[in-house]
Amino acid sequence: EHINFMATYGRGLICLSISETRAEELKLPLMNPDNWKKKTTAFTVSIESSTNITTGISAFDRAETVKAAINPNFKSGDIVSPGHVFPLIAWDGGVLTRAGHTEAAVDISRLAGLNDSAVICEIMNDDGTMARVPDLIPYAKKHSINIGTIQDLIAYRIKNDLLIKKIPEKQHQIKNIYSDIFEFNVFENTIDGLHHATLHLGDLSKQDSVMTRVHPVQGFDDIIMNFNNPKTKDLHASIEKIKSHGSGIIVLINNPILGDLGKLSNDEKVKYYGLGAQIPVSYTHLTLPTSQL
């Protein structure tokens, strides 16, 4: 019934989002391995159930293929290629690793306590163009479908999933260029393994609010305080403000793509600023504001 609805009212390509683990179990090769490296949509070869189907294209046949592909008791021999269902591999970590529809579908299924897979389909308008938000709102009302955004899902997971792990052995004191002693801590992102750091002054656990800056690391510009870089200049101003206040924290987010946050999508900004907000929360039970210094 659902496959038939997608084919009739969705009109786009019907795909099956699955986890990396399940793709390995089924021994499904990527259609284009380069897509995985570039974090673009990871299509595998198309598939078909090896039993209980006829042509493979009917709604019933495609539903049977989906059921076979997600059934943990079924192995690679129960699936053949090519076929009429198109699997997509979701990155481990979901939308917090790649802000895509494939990952969003698997995340929602997991959050609902269901199998970590989902059938997805892009929606086309009657004239053959792709449906956008203004088209989707009346569409959702007509068919009684809820609407959600990847950005909202990212925000929900950041709020509810603990992504940051403190690395105690990296803890030590350093002096900044102002000769003030800041405590230096290193944190690991449990999703992608990247390390991030903090510089904090004072006991943050006893404060009602904490002066905070989330700063995308600017490399050598930050080291030499190159004020021609406006972000490094902002970092300097934040250090001065924390010094004057007597306490506060600077969260140093380490990621090569963060050199210019202005070029990131809203989804990526939510992800990285949300990550930055989780780190100071680990110092205290307080819920910190997401605004920057």
Regions found by a protein language model. Name each.
Residues 1-286, 291:
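Catalytic domains of riboflavin
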